[in-house]
A protein has these predicted regions:
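Conserved GNAT-fold acetyl-CoA-binding loop/helix
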Residues: 49-69, 82
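Secondary-structure boundary/capping residues
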Residues: 48, 57, 76-79, 143
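Hydrophobic residues in alpha-helical segments
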Residues: 43, 52, 74-75
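Short loop/turn motifs at secondary-structure junctions and domain boundaries
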Residues: 72-77, 163
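A short hydrophobic/aromatic micro-motif that marks alpha-helical segments and, especially, helix-coil
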Residues: 59-61, 74, 192-193
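Acyl-donor (CoA/ACP) binding surface of acyl/acetyltransferases
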Residues: 1-46, 81-222
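A generic secondary-structure signal
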Residues: 69-70, 133
């Protein structure tokens, strides 16, 4: 499914604003203000945002407002959203880690991609990059994910990538006037080390924001 694993190569140290992880066809990196046009284009599709509590975007200003609040979220350690970009096509979506508990060494992953990139392998590669970030760089021990009980395609995708189905949280996610049940998935460090996401070749450059790094992890010891 993925190219054979290569040792992840750390590039020369840069600041947190330069964090990027690069795979065979994708890169995840810190968002910039000039990403607004691409995010508006991809997230103005109602099918793309169907399962989320926001969207679809109706103006570029909404994408700009989203990008403007991200630096404060990175500074506080509340959410680490990164641009997913094709190396040959530019930004195609967002993948992020949230619900951090550094004490428990866990976080939750969420991803959205433009419709043109569904079924292309971009979801799997972007999650491989983000899970490498979480486990190998930040020092996490668990990455979880939620998906609606009705979103069967997402559930199957998570299972293919090695996430384990752990149960259902009833009336967990408010979606407009509805409150949805969600299926909980989890990926432990040991699952990742022995699963398909670990097979993706990853190059890391820059440094993550300090608020997301587990004390004593390989990054802080480096």
């Amino acid at each position: 499914m993925f190219p054979l694993v290569q040792a992840a190569r750390a590039q020369p140290s840069q600041g947190p604003g330069d964090l990027a992880l690069t795979g065979p066809t994708l890169r995840v990196r810190v968002p910039r203000s000039d990403d607004a046009a691409a995010l508006f284009r991809e997230a103005s599709d109602a099918d793309v945002t169907r399962w989320f509590s926001w969207g679809p975007y109706e103006s570029r200003a909404q994408a700009e407002a989203y990008l403007e609040r991200l630096p404060a979220e990175r500074e506080s350690g509340s959410q680490l959203d990164l641009i997913v970009e094709r190396l040959d096509a530019g930004p195609i979506g967002i993948s992020g880690l949230s619900e951090f508990s550094l004490r428990d060494r866990r976080a939750t992953i969420g991803t959205w991609l433009g419709r043109a990139w569904w079924g292309t392998g971009a979801n799997g590669e972007s999650k491989a990059l983000m899970c490498h970030l979480g486990f190998a760089v930040l020092g996490l021990e668990r990455i979880g994910s939620y998906t609606s009980v009705d979103h069967v395609r997402s559930q199957r995708a998570l299972e293919r990538l090695g996430f384990g189905r752990e149960g259902v949280l009833r009336r967990f996610h408010r979606h407009g006037e509805r409150v949805l049940d969600v299926v909980v998935f989890g990926l432990l460090r040991s699952d990742w080390e022995n699963g398909p996401l670990r097979e993706v070749a990853v190059t890391v450059s820059g440094q993550p924001p300090p608020a997301f790094v587990v004390a004593g992890s390989a990054l802080t010891a480096r």
